Amino acid sequence: MPKILDSHSHYLPPEVAQHTAFFKVNWSDIERHLTLMDQNGIERSVLLYPTSDAHIQMGGWQKLCDVYNLEISKIVKKYHDRFIGGGILPVDQPQNFKKELQRMEDLGLRILSLAYSYEGKYLDDPIFDPVFEFAGRTGMPVHVHPQIMNPIGEERLRDPLLTPVLEYVFDVSACIGKMMMSGTFLKHPDVKFIFAHYGGVLPFVKERFDNTYQMLRKRNFVKDLTKDPSEYFKNLYFDISGSKSAASLMCALEVVDPGHILFGSDFPANQNLAAIIAVIDGAPLSAAEKSAIFANNFPQLLAL
């Protein structure tokens, strides 16, 4: 059984889960999480915020941060050799970002857990510049997760199946595209961005990005990005987010090399961890490349 580090899993403290519409059941069972980790050879897991509606019922993002970040830090301290904590920010109060970032450091949280968008505001918005400056300065990775609250296209689809299946992956691709077009990646070259779900539809439109950019650039219809879009994508990291599709993995490898793909279970949304592991085990990759995806890439991001 390979050594595995899980870069994408979830735990919602009961104090938060009780204020959500969806996450009340199965999202607060840390013992179940540990059992599945042991059964599947997962040494450590990163705990990320799944995005929820808790901030609405709890009276705002700051109150959510007060509870969530503290409770995640307690789990990390209790199981310090098994879990790595990701902290969240009061996105509706950017004036509090600096204070909350310092609090995250003081609590021992090692990763910034952000969403692709917040009520239509993407991470290319200037309010996030101080966050990325902090991440670049401290080396804290930024994990970017799907947004369940009003993702792209929500006003058109409004469907309990189509929203998580289609809108989530379109939202991440829109986020990456907007960050590229706004110059966010150029402005913050030292930030280690990790995007969930292979970057959404990005692997499928990589060639279209380059070809269309080159065509439009010749006619001066698009600004000079200094390099093809695919060159930006090579510097990003993508986690597999519980995917059991070998085709998706191979498609992602056309965008980035194995050194930029991370194992991620997306537990408890996905509980068949063995099937996820089998996809990487069965891929036409070298033993070293498989080990990189399973375990060796992530410690380099965190200096573990």
Language-model segments: which ranges?
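Mid-to-C-terminal alpha-helical segments outside catalytic/metal-binding sites
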Residues: P2-R44, K74, K99-R103, V191-K192, ...
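Active-site gating loops and adjacent loop-to-helix segments of metal-dependent hydrolytic enzymes
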Residues: H10-S28, N150-V172, N211-N235
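Active-site gating/metal-coordination segments in enzymes
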Residues: E43, Y49-I176
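Hydrophobic faces of well-ordered beta-strands that scaffold small-molecule active sites
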Residues: L5-S9, S45-L47, I84-G87, L112-L114, ...
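Active-site-adjacent C-terminal substructures of enzyme catalytic domains
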Residues: V169-D171, H188-D190, F221-N272
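A structural motif corresponding to the C-terminal end of an alpha-helix
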Residues: M37-E43, K74-F83, G183-V191, E231-L236, ...
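Catalytic metal-binding/acid-base residues of hydrolase active sites
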Residues: H10, S117, Q147-I148, G199, ...
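Aromatic-lined glycan-binding groove of carbohydrate-active enzymes
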Residues: G183, P189-E231
